[in-house]
């Protein structure tokens, strides 16, 4: 597996061992599915109570104890404290800054994975169209990826099911030079 933080590998292992989907976990913690998935891949951090709820949804302490007991000699045991700390922004991957996440560190450009490459291709092909339409409809600015929501749905279609990805970001206008003052 590519270079994921320690806690992410543990979370993904637990999810797979328990036969859960990201949607199952998201519903158990009452959070959006895509955001929950981002946590599992180290692209977000959360508060301690949500981190604890995730661990509970994955089977609680008993799961981790049972999992560690099944390991063979030489395999690394999962330290539940490290997982909890990583989720809540206190892990070693946070580089000494609580909650700091190195977003995009697991991503290469262009991506080699076919699904990720298709998403990259969408931006390569339609990126300037999105940019032009944002400008025409909103003015000079950007779509925030900070004040942002996203979702993914499956849509039935007679020609084959469709993937519907929604990106919902706040429009942020660039400042007018008159607001800069004089130097």
From Swiss-Prot:
Q: Give the record's family classification.
A: Belongs to the cyanase family.
Q: What role does it play?
A: Catalyzes the reaction of cyanate with bicarbonate to produce ammonia and carbon dioxide.
Q: What is this protein called?
A: Cyanate hydratase
Where in the sequence is the active site?
118, 121, 144
Give the reactions, separated by semicolons, that this protein catalyses. cyanate + hydrogencarbonate + 3 H(+) = NH4(+) + 2 CO2
EC assignment:
4.2.1.104
Q: Where is the signal peptide?
A: none
Q: Which InterPro entries match?
A: Cyanase, Cyanate_lyase_C, Cyanate_lyase_C_sf, CYNS_N, Lambda_DNA-bd_dom_sf
List, in alphabetical order, the Gene Ontology terms for molecular function in this entry: cyanate hydratase activity; DNA binding
EC class name: lyase
Assigned keywords, A-Z: Lyase
């Amino acid at each position: 597996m590519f270079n994921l933080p320690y806690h992410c590998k543990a979370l993904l292992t637990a999810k797979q061992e328990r036969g859960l989907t990201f949607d199952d976990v998201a519903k158990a913690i009452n959070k959006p599915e895509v955001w929950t998935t981002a946590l599992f891949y180290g692209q977000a951090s959360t508060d301690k109570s949500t981190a604890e709820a995730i661990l509970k949804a994955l089977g609680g302490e008993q799961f981790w104890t049972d999992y560690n007991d099944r390991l063979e000699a030489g395999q690394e045991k999962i330290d539940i404290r490290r997982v909890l700390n990583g989720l809540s922004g206190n892990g070693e991957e946070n580089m000494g800054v609580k909650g700091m996440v190195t977003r995009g560190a697991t991503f290469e450009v262009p991506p080699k994975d076919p699904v990720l490459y298709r998403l990259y291709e969408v931006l390569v092909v339609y990126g300037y169209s999105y940019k032009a339409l944002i400008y025409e409809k909103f003015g000079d600015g950007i779509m925030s990826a900070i004040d942002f929501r996203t979702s993914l749905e499956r849509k039935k279609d007679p020609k084959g099911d469709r993937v519907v990805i929604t990106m919902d970001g706040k429009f942020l206008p660039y400042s007018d030079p008159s607001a800069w003052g004089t130097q």
